[in-house]
Amino acid sequence: MLSFSLFIPSAAAAQTEENTDVAPNQYEKKDIEIDTNYLHEDTYYEEKTELPEEQKDITFDKPKDKDAELIKDLFTSTNAEDSNTIAAQSKQLGITFAEKPMTKTSSTETEDEQETSSLLLPMIYVVLILLGIAGIVFLIPKVTAQENKKA
């Protein structure tokens, strides 16, 4: 019954009053006052106040530190050999990276390893496929024979 009333709009509609007077909004034009004086006169929008004495004494200059030179000398070194960088240590030890690293001269060992590894994977696949086929060949007749005995 409820679903039937949903499809009929007159049954679901609420009763409303017929004589509802709705008055439209009336727009009355009002004059807009735009103050453009601040565009022409700087003194109009600037607030004139005098700075207090405490703010007059404030400076933005960094005070000179007497120990700055000593600290700078501690953490900087002009001698490159005393430096603890990788470049300085490799220079002290006589290690250069300009030469190419030594490689194996015989490539037959790597070829043999590649051949055995390339043959090993297909052999594993063949063995797995043969085991799967053998399992299917032997198991399916046994299962069908057991079903025939039950029937």
Swiss-Prot record:
Annotated membrane topology: Single-pass membrane protein
NCBIfam families per the UniProt record, alphabetical: T7SS_EssA_Firm
Subcellular location: Cell membrane
One Pfam family named in its UniProt record: EssA
Keywords in alphabetical order: Cell membrane, Membrane, Transmembrane, Transmembrane helix
Superkingdom of the source species: Bacteria
Record's keyword annotation contains Manganese: no
Major place of residence: membrane
Bilayer-spanning residue ranges: 120-140
Cysteine pairings via disulfide bonds: none
Protein name: ESX secretion system protein YueC
Function as written in the Swiss-Prot or TrEMBL entry: Required for YukE secretion. Probable component or regulator of the ESX/ESAT-6-like secretion system (BsEss).
Family indicated by similarity: Belongs to the EssA family.
GO cellular component: plasma membrane
Lineage: Bacteria, Bacillati, Bacillota, Bacilli, Bacillales
Source organism of this protein record: Bacillus subtilis (strain 168)
Knockout consequences: Cells lacking this gene are blocked in YukE secretion.
